[in-house]
Structures are given as C-alpha cells and as structure tokens.
Amino acid sequence: MLDISYQANTFHISHQGRPVGSIQTYSNPYHQTNAYLRLDLADYDCTIAEQLFQSLQTFLGEKPLQVLLSSAEQEKIYFLTAAGFVCKRKCYEFEVTKQDYLSQTGTTNLNIVRKGTALYQRACQQVFNHYQTVHQDINPWTASQEEFEKGLPDLVYTDSENWAFVENIEIAYVCGKDEQSFDSFIQAVIGSLFEQYEQISFEADDCDPIAMRLADHFRFPNKPSWDTYLLES
C-alpha cells in the first residue's frame, strides 16, 4: 500500500505504513513544460517506482517529469529507470589546460565582436535558434528571446559562420554552420584563449553536436556527467 500526501511543494511518501521519504517539486521559469523533482528517499525500492511516479504525474497534471542526477547516483538511476524514466541528456563540465588538448591550433581568422554591434545581435539570434533546436525535445525554452539574451556574455568570437560566446576563461555558448567548419573555428578560439589563460572551462550537452565537437578536442575518458531523466506524459 502506497500512501502519498502533498504539502508545501513536497510529496511525503509511505509504503505499507512505513515512511519512505519525500520528493520535492519545483519549477523553472525558463523551462515550464516539465515538472521538476528532487528525490530524498530513505529507500529506493524499485518495486514501487512505477506506481509512485504514475501517481505523481497524475497529481501534477500529466506533465513530463524531469529529474537531474549525477551519473554517480546509481541507486537513484535504477529507481528512475524502473519507473520508465529515460536519460535524455548528459551534461559534461570541463576545466582544461593545454595538456588536455588533443588538436592543433586553428588558423581560422577570428573576429571579436562586442555587445551593441549588429554582428553581436546576429550571434545572439544564431545561438538562440541553436539552443532551442537542441533542447526542444527535452525541456524547451519557454521564456522570451530577450530573457535568453540577458544570460549571454558581452563578447563573441566569430568567423561569420560559427560563434562562441566567451566570458574570461569560460566558453559559455557555441553554435556553428556545421561540425566540419566549426572544428577549425573552435581550434582557433581555443588557441586564442590558451594564449591568455592557463585554464579554460565549458559545458557540453550530448544533445548538442556542436558543443560535443568542442568537447572532443579534449581528453575525457569515463568523465562523470549531470544527467537529465525524463518520464514522458
């Protein structure tokens, strides 16, 4: 017997009269399609997983359910997959030095453009379109383009076909014409940054082929990731 009560954005769960723990719900103002969950259970019993999340999904208006986990959280991962969740996205975080770099320095001519220019605005449009495309099937952007642009750095590297928003040591957003032309472009960006800094950082989602091309220029065997699990409605 599964007993679920809901209070202050938190589901309290008991099984056969014994408290199992809680699952907190929260929302993301920029991605409002899914209902977000944070798991805090004492016991991840896979035999109750399917019934539990079906009940939660019904309560939350049949929205897709989304959970973010570290790839190291194996017990929670087994629990979610037992309920029908699917890993839809892996996000890899990088802090790298020249010693991690596997490629040559690119020879592409780079322009550095700043906020307030026409080319910067074109870059904003390109990266917004790209972001929408690669995340559409997971958790679509539901806020305005203006809101998205507020989070972009003020400086862009470009060769007029490929774009990298950069803030100090961080490559924050990338997009490109295609993977091949992006390769030589991003090699030039990496070379430029390593001339300025000992270390650079970036994130790469495996749903984004352009960002993964950036990641492929560095060593990352068996790298841990932040994984997005989704239970479709």
Residue ranges and their predicted role:
Residues 15, 80, 115, 147-148, ...:
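Structural motif
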Residues 2-4, 8, 84-87, 151-153, ...:
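Short glycine-aromatic motifs
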Residues 1, 41, 56-60, 83, ...:
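Hydrophobic, Leu/Ile/Phe/Ala-enriched alpha-helical segments that form helix-helix packing faces
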Residues 107-173:
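Flexible, substrate/cofactor-facing loop regions flanked by secondary structure
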Residues 1-6, 97-117:
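Conserved N-terminal entry element of GNAT/NAT acetyltransferase domains
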Residues 44-108, 185-193, 198-233:
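Acyl-donor-binding surface of acyltransferase catalytic domains
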Residues 1-55, 154-186:
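Conserved donor-binding loop and adjoining core beta-sheet/short helix segment
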